[in-house]
């Protein structure tokens, strides 16, 4: 276990199971049937899709992130059928960030928390001035207006469109190009979306 994982675990050491939050979860599955203990309520039918961090270390294991918003974005889905069968799927968002991490590199970039080991001064300057465009979106998901388009978001301008059925990545959208009328978008956009529609 590396130092960054040790540091993250100290924060929640009193909470049983908290350490698992900081472990890489690189397996992707599609429609795996879950074992249900007990009985689900009859009204519980539908699909729940969320996202969050799924990988903390670079593919070659040389560096790791230390903040929840920096972990590599991974979608998860629970699909509850009318007959009570529950299926689970999970898939990483296929972004430039993901491609670089999968190829063994952690791209020098501005992050929410420090990386372990820390960037050297040249890497830090490179990250601040010319680092790759941040397209990792592990914070939230939402639907664009009343369309059938869904995106994963973070506080950076890039939103990653995905198929809510297959969890496949459809591509990148910039906040300024979305059909959310009357909004000024820039790097400080908020990933916690509010709506006045139910």
Give the positions of each predicted feature.
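Beta-propeller domains
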Residues: 1-198
């Amino acid at each position: 276990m590396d130092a960054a994982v040790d540091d993250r675990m100290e924060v929640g050491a009193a909470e049983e199971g908290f350490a698992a939050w900081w472990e890489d979860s690189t397996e992707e599955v599609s429609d795996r049937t879950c074992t249900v203990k007990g009985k689900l309520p009859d009204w519980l039918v539908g699909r729940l899709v969320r996202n969050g961090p799924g990988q903390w270390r670079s593919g070659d294991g040389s560096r790791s992130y230390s903040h929840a918003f920096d972990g590599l974005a991974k979608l998860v889905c629970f699909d509850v059928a009318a007959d009570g069968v529950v299926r689970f799927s999970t898939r990483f968002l296929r972004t430039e960030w993901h491609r670089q991490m999968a190829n063994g590199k952690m791209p020098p970039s501005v992050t929410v928390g420090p990386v372990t080991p820390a960037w050297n001064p040249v890497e830090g300057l490179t990250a601040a001035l010319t680092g790759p465009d941040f397209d990792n979106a592990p914070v939230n998901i939402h639907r664009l207006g009343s369309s059938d388009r869904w995106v994963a978001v973070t506080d950076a301008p890039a939103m990653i469109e995905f198929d809510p059925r297959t969890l496949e990545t459809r591509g990148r959208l910039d906040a300024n190009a979305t059909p959310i009328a009357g909004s000024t978008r820039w790097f400080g956009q908020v990933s916690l979306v509010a709506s006045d529609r139910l």
